[in-house]
Each structure stands twice: as structure tokens, then as C-alpha cells.
């Protein structure tokens, strides 16, 4: 067994994902999810060597109790694994302009994450709770923060500055930051390997499609544009997020329809997207089932989702100049051959030609090209953000 193990923590507001990752191979030794924090049925599920386990955490428990359970109840059963953990790696959604790469956590880093909390009010406070819980449970291990926004810090000003008064950026940091950076980094790197090219000479467009979704143009291994903005709300149609809309709709909802700003924020983040259009579900699998059954709302939601995505992909050929591959990843990108086919058909101007057999095969964790050899390459690469976090954690300890 490797001695390069890292405990990776991804703390949400009401959940905590964890995995013990071999930084050399990307294999997980143990992985799991603690969820329903603050509720009576707070629980934890985990998997070891394909075997699944579940336990109650106790009513109204949260991050600290979950980390303590991982240490005492799970790792306590696998002391050989626990002894080889070299670091704790934390996913942090927003690092603003302060953090352009992964860092070892100290008091100044914690203060910086707190400063960025206004840009990610649902995520950064939860990450801080997880960091403090991990520090209490693993006082002797270094803690590393890996930021979703860091990969996008290579974008030029023309891509990240909004057409608002410049002082709003200069004085308040209002700009495009982007998300899913760790995923876009991983799949763009893997795409270069699959193409047999040097990363510095590889131009790809990465579509990370899940309940949250974003597209990134990656030129020579660096992000040059991305669809999410100041927050994850901008860009594509998502599970419950609206993505791009006319900003004046906000004022129409408030002034004409009597919404409060909090209600508008909730509407755009939690009631829109696939759920709002379909009036059925935010789950893409349910949308596809509805589409197959002729459900009008599901059909419209699917068409808008694919159309918006194809438009973004087409526009991102502009900063690249040359496209070596289009890469699909994330839960939807890795598993929905229907959506991939629809998007590629909408991109007919680029001469993508779907290979039905390849497209069917590239699902459920299988990587591969999904187009014929007669035109541009589109491929599926399953993401592995935890591996990137583990690699960064180990590299920072050298």
C-alpha cells in the first residue's frame, strides 16, 4: 500500500464528503458522505473495498461530529490506513484573487477564506467549519486548501472584467471568478494525455455538467475563459440555477411583482434551471425520462439546456483559436449520451460527427472518444477532483 495517502474533505452547508486518496494513483481507500446535518436523521455512509456501510450520527449533529466519527469509528477499524495519512486536503469553493494556487493552511489562510465568504456565503463558512473540525481531530497533520477559483486566475482582464464601472472591480473585487477549476484542471490535463500531446500545446473546451455546470476554455493548460462568474449562478442552465438572464428581470420581479431580493435570489438559485422550466425535476435523469415520454416541460428544459451549452462551447473557440478536443465531464457529461449527441449535433458547423457506439460506451466511468475519426474530437473524461486535491497536498509537503 502507498504511503502517500491524503484525507480529502469537501464540506457543504449540510453535508461532508470525504475520501482517503492515494496521491500517486488516485485510488480511494475509503470514501463516504455524511449528510442531513442539523436534522434528527443526521447520518454517515461510507465504502471500503466495494463494501458499503451506514450509521446514524445522532440527532442535530454536524461537521465536528462527522469528522470525529471518521477518525474514531471508521479509521479506528483500519489503523494501517490511518497511519499512512500524510495530510488533510480541503476543497474550498472561493479564494477570490487572494489565492492563485493551493496553500498550506495557517491563520492567515483561514482569515483569507473568511474574507472571501461574502463571495460564497453558502460554501466558505462550511469549509471553515470543516477545517477547524479537522484541525481538532488531526492536530499533528498539515492541512491544505485547494481552491475551485484558483485555476481561473490565469484569465485575462478582457475575460473576467464586467462592463460595469471599473471601480467596482478595483475597490470591491466584483469580477468573473469561475468555479469547478479543480475539475477543469484535471480533465484538461487528462485530455492532453489522451491526445498524445504536450499540455502546453493542447487547446480544449471542458464542459463540467452536473447539478451545477460550467464550460471552460483551456489554452496550453491555462484557463482563458469560463462561464460561471462572480458566483456559480452565471452561465449555463443548471439543475436549479437559471444561468444567464437579463439582469433587469430582477428589478421587474421586485418592482412589478412584489418579490423581495432574498426571494429573487432563492428563485434564481433554487427554483429555476431544469426544475423551473420543466416544472418536474432538477435531476437530469428525470428530465430525460420525461423527454422520452413526451413531457412538454421536460422536452423544453432539455432543449434549452443543450442549446445554451452549445452556444457557450461555440463561443469559446474564439479565445482558443484552435480546438484540439471538446471534453465532457461531471455526472451529466459522463453519463448522458443523449445530451452529448444533441449538443454535438447543434455544433454541426464544426463538423463534429457522433459515433453512436463510442458514445454509448463512454458512460458509467468509462473514458473515451465519442466522435468518429473523420472530424474534430469530442471525448468523455470522468473527473477526479479528489485526486488533484491529494496531489496538491502531497506536493506542498515536499
Swiss-Prot record:
- The residues that cross the membrane are none
Q: Reaction(s) catalyzed by this protein?
A: acetate + ATP = acetyl phosphate + ADP
Q: Where is it chiefly localized?
A: cytoplasm
Q: Name one GO cellular component term.
A: cytosol
- A GO molecular function for this record? acetate kinase activity
Pathway, per record: Metabolic intermediate biosynthesis; acetyl-CoA biosynthesis; acetyl-CoA from acetate: step 1/2
User: Which key words are in the record?
Assistant: ATP-binding, Cytoplasm, Kinase, Magnesium, Metal-binding, Nucleotide-binding, Transferase
Biological process (GO), any one: acetyl-CoA biosynthetic process
Catalytic residues as annotated in Swiss-Prot or TrEMBL: 148
* Annotated residues for binding of substrate: 91
- Co-factor remark: Mg(2+). Can also accept Mn(2+).
Q: What class of enzyme is it?
A: transferase
Question: What's the EC number here?
Answer: 2.7.2.1
Q: Which CDD domains match?
A: ASKHA_NBD_AcK_PK (cd24010)
Which cofactors is this protein said to need? Mg(2+); Mn(2+)
Instruction: Detail which positions bind Mg(2+).
Output: 10, 385
Q: How does it assemble?
A: Homodimer.
* Function statement: Catalyzes the formation of acetyl phosphate from acetate and ATP. Can also catalyze the reverse reaction.
Q: What is the name attached to this protein's record?
A: Acetate kinase
Specify the species.
Answer: Shewanella loihica (strain ATCC BAA-1088 / PV-4)
Classification of source organism = Bacteria, Pseudomonadati, Pseudomonadota, Gammaproteobacteria, Alteromonadales
Amino acid at each position: 500500500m502507498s504511503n502517500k495517502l491524503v484525507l480529502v474533505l469537501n464540506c457543504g452547508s449540510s453535508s461532508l464528503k470525504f475520501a482517503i486518496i492515494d496521491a500517486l494513483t488516485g485510488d480511494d481507500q475509503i470514501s463516504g458522505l455524511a449528510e442531513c446535518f442539523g436534522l434528527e436523521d443526521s447520518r454517515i455512509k461510507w465504502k471500503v473495498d466495494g463494501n458499503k456501510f451506514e450509521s446514524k450520527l445522532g440527532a442535530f449533529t454536524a461537521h465536528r461530529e462527522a469528522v470525529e466519527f471518521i477518525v474514531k469509528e471508521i479509521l479506528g477499524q483500519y489503523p494501517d490506513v490511518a497511519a499512512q495519512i500524510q495530510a488533510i486536503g480541503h476543497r474550498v469553493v472561493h479564494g477570490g484573487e487572494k489565492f492563485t494556487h493551493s496553500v498550506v493552511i495557517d491563520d492567515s489562510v483561514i482569515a483569507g477564506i473568511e474574507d472571501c465568504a461574502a463571495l460564497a456565503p453558502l460554501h466558505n463558512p462550511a469549509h471553515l467549519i470543516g477545517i477547524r473540525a479537522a484541525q481538532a481531530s488531526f492536530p499533528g497533520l498539515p492541512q491544505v486548501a485547494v481552491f475551485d477559483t484558483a485555476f481561473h486566475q490565469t484569465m485575462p482582464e478582457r475575460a473576467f472584467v464586467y462592463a460595469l464601472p471599473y471601480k467596482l472591480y478595483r475597490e470591491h473585487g466584483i469580477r468573473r471568478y469561475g468555479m469547478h477549476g479543480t475539475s477543469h484542471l484535471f480533465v484538461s490535463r487528462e485530455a492532453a494525455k489522451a491526445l498524445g500531446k504536450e499540455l502546453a500545446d493542447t487547446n480544449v473546451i471542458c464542459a463540467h455538467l452536473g447539478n451545477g455546470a460550467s464550460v471552460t476554455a483551456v489554452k496550453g493548460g491555462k484557463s482563458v475563459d469560463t462561464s460561471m462568474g462572480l458566483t456559480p449562478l452565471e452561465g449555463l442552465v443548471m439543475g436549479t440555477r437559471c444561468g444567464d438572464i437579463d439582469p433587469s428581470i430582477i428589478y421587474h420581479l421586485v418592482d412589478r411583482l412584489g418579490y423581495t431580493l432574498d426571494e429573487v435570489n432563492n428563485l434564481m438559485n433554487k427554483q429555476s434551471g431544469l426544475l423551473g422550466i420543466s416544472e418536474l425535476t432538477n435531476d437530469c435523469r428525470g428530465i430525460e425520462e420525461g423527454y422520452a415520454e413526451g413531457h412538454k416541460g421536460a422536452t423544453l428544459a432539455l432543449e434549452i439546456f443543450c442549446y445554451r451549452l452549445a452556444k457557450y462551447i461555440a463561443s469559446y473557440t474564439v479565445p482558443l483559436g484552435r480546438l484540439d478536443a471538446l471534453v465532457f465531464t461531471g455526472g451529466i457529461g459522463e453519463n448522458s449520451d443523449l445530451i452529448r449527441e444533441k449538443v454535438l449535433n447543434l455544433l454541426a458547423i464544426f463538423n463534429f460527427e457522433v459515433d453512436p457506439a463510442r458514445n454509448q460506451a463512454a458512460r458509467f466511468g468509462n473514458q473515451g472518444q465519442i466522435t468518429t475519426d473523420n472530424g474534430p474530437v469530442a471525448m468523455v473524461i470522468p473527473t477526479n477532483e479528489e485526486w488533484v486535491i491529494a496531489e496538491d497536498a502531497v506536493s506542498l509537503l515536499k
